[in-house]
Regions:
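C-terminal amphipathic helix plus adjacent low-complexity
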Residues: 221-222, 252, 260-263, 284, ...
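Phosphate-binding active sites in nucleotide-utilizing proteins
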Residues: 4-47, 51-68, 72, 244
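Catalytic binding pocket for nucleotide-activated donors in carbohydrate/polymer assembly enzymes
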Residues: 165, 322-323, 327, 331-421, ...
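Conserved catalytic-core segment of nucleotide-activated headgroup transferases in glycan assembly
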Residues: 9-29, 174-284, 297-313
Length: 448
């Protein structure tokens, strides 16, 4: 008897990640699944629960859930919703679990397990945990042996990330979700097999046409995730690519916050422009002294003029925007989840800096699953070096050419596996069966 509780079983990141999985698990012979809606039933609400988050409402809800006599209770949004977070403070089932739909520890002694993915933790967690990739690799070999298939079981964690959680980490081999979403319909220019429908000649002509058009760098994350440390990256992209246009979201419900962010970003962009103009003047002066002629002139028109803000879009409009983007930018230290998944689902390259994330490296894991590759450990550098690498990667992949074609082709070919929770390196299926089996195995073992 397994219960899943959330205030977001609707058009919300948590609901979209879990509903497909629940539909599968409800047909499992070995599980009796209870779906517990902790919302007020009002679309767009914060999930105030049965009449509110007061003590009486919490007591009533806790008694109702306890009466189900569940073996396991899985929470989808602890930390995102006040009511479900209040529920999670109580012991309503012998075993209680949190899902990575909200990527961080609950810090509660009443939550026993945190379900995540090898693609989000593994060697990807090395720099965040302050360990080198070599140390993580040694631990992985000692735990299972080189080349062994990862085993999904209660306690299947490595120690590089465990210290950051009050719960015991349970790392599934795949992503742990089934994302069946009709809104994610590829544009008609893409073939049914996920490859571009154009001929090589047509693609070359399109690239020639794109060579001098503006390049769209899109960051579709909410304002809460726009950390000051990320401002320098946005400014650096504008300075590095004279054709770059950066598109950011603007929410009318956060006008004061937005105005402060706008001023802060403007200051970073202006500083980058001054540095770029100084470098250009120095280069021209050196060229004149050496008799080689002028190399380039300072930037004219202003970098800030290439920053655009758009109001929130509908689901389909949002997806189409990401399909039109040349590259999607994942911010740090708190990056995207479902929005990154959507970008990868339409074959748009995503650039991220996993080493600068303070939570699970969701974007790196999703990229690995979409491109059907293994996540590899990497040497960790000073944060400024990672920012420089981020800018260089974004500019390189946004430009027309072989790299852009290669990345988009790989993402489109791996689309089905990504949406159905498959793991990187060929470790996940494309029909959701592997994800269903992972969850059934974990739930059965946890209840034993």
């Amino acid at each position: 008897r397994v219960g899943f509780v959330s205030a977001h079983f609707r058009w919300h990141s948590v609901g979209r990640l879990t509903i497909g999985l629940l539909e599968r698990l409800c047909t499992s012979r070995g599980l009796q699944v209870f779906v517990i809606d902790a919302s007020s039933g009002v679309e767009g609400s914060s999930g105030s629960g049965s009449g509110g988050a007061g003590s009486d409402a919490l007591r009533t809800a806790r008694e109702a859930i306890a009466a189900l006599r569940l073996d396991i209770l899985v929470y989808g949004d602890v930390g995102m919703d006040a009511f479900t977070t209040g529920l999670a403070h109580g012991r309503l089932s012998p075993v209680q679990v949190a899902f990575w739909g909200h990527p961080g520890t609950t810090g509660l002694s009443t939550i026993d397990y945190f379900v995540t993915s090898d693609l989000f933790e593994g060697e990807l967690g090395a720099g965040w945990a302050g360990r080198s990739p070599d140390v993580v690799g040694d631990e992985a070999t000692a735990a299972g042996g080189e080349g062994d298939e990862p085993e999904t079981r209660v306690g299947a964690e490595r120690h590089d990330r465990q210290h950051a959680f009050s719960e015991q980490l349970v790392r599934l081999g795949g992503l742990g979700f089934i994302f069946d979403d009709p809104a994610l319909t590829l544009p008609s220019s893409y073939g049914g097999d996920g490859r571009a429908a154009s001929s090589p000649e047509a693609m070359e002509k399109r690239e020639a046409d794109e060579a001098n058009r503006p390049r769209l760098y899109v960051c579709t994350q909410s304002l809460m995730k726009m950390h000051p440390a990320f401002d320098a990256v946005l400014a650096g992209i504008l300075a590095a690519d004279p054709l770059a246009q950066i598109l950011l979201l603007r929410d009318s419900r956060q006008l004061l916050w937005h105005s402060r962010f706008r001023r802060r970003l403007r200051a970073a962009v202006d500083a980058a422009e001054q540095s770029a103009n100084f470098a250009a003047v120095s280069t021209c002066a050196a060229a004149a002294v050496n008799g080689t002629g002028p190399a380039s002139s300072p930037t004219r028109g202003g970098l800030w003029g290439r920053v655009r803000f758009v109001s929130p879009l509908s689901g389909r409009e949002f997806f189409r925007l990401q399909c039109r983007a040349d590259v999607v930018l994942d911010p740090f230290p708190f990056g995207g989840g479902v929005t990154t998944l959507e970008a990868l689902a339409c074959g748009t390259p995503v650039v991220t800096a996993g080493a600068l994330q303070s939570v699970h490296r969701l974007a790196e894991g999703l990229i690995a699953a979409a491109a059907n590759t293994q996540c590899q450990g990497r040497e960790e550098h000073h944060p400024e070096e990672h920012k420089g690498e981020y800018i260089a990667k974004a500019v390189a992949v946004a430009a027309p050419g072989a790299l852009k074609r290669k990345v988009r082709r790989a993402l489109r070919c791996g689309r089905n596996g990504l949406l159905h929770g498959g793991g990187g390196g060929g470790g996940g299926g494309e029909d959701g069966s592997d994800v269903e089996a992972d969850w059934e195995r974990f739930l059965t073992n946890a209840a034993a």
